[in-house]
Amino acid sequence: LQIREPFFPILEVVEFAFPKLWPEFCLTVGEMAEMGDNHGLTFIDRSEIRLRVDVYHGVEKKKGRDRLTLAHEVGHFLLHNNPGYARAARNSADIPAYRSSEWQANAFAGALLMPIEFLRTATSLREVAEICGVTSDAAETQTRGLARAGLLNNSALTEIGISRKRKGDHGGSPS
């Protein structure tokens, strides 16, 4: 693919590259009445990612939240290829956050759409959101998580305007 810019073409990769890599893969679009509150679903057993119709159209229009939803589902598809594990881990409150399939899919989506190399040189959260095609909340959450993990140096934190630890910040998901 040789993608060399911070804006990751998530829809193009899923629609055109995934079927070449996994011939059984399909991206489907579900109606709002069918999917309800589910913006996206991944069916590992049948190699399918399903997006709610409004989310699919949002990804087409490069809306940040919808791009993150698709990247999140891609995370499930690539990371959680054991259907039993994916379901069990999603529903377990007794495991550390990082072992949760939902946390992992969020972390994957953040890393995919906001490359750390770009975050290290970005001058503002607004720049991250605009260039990476994500929401400003996602840009802040990803940056804060990487800073907390010690993966962004202090000069980058100063440039982006995120302190290493905010008052009342006790950790959590990186995205």
Question: At which residue positions do the language-model features occur?
Answer:
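Active-site hotspot residues in diverse enzymes, especially metal/ion-binding acidic/histidine motifs
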Residues: 1-175
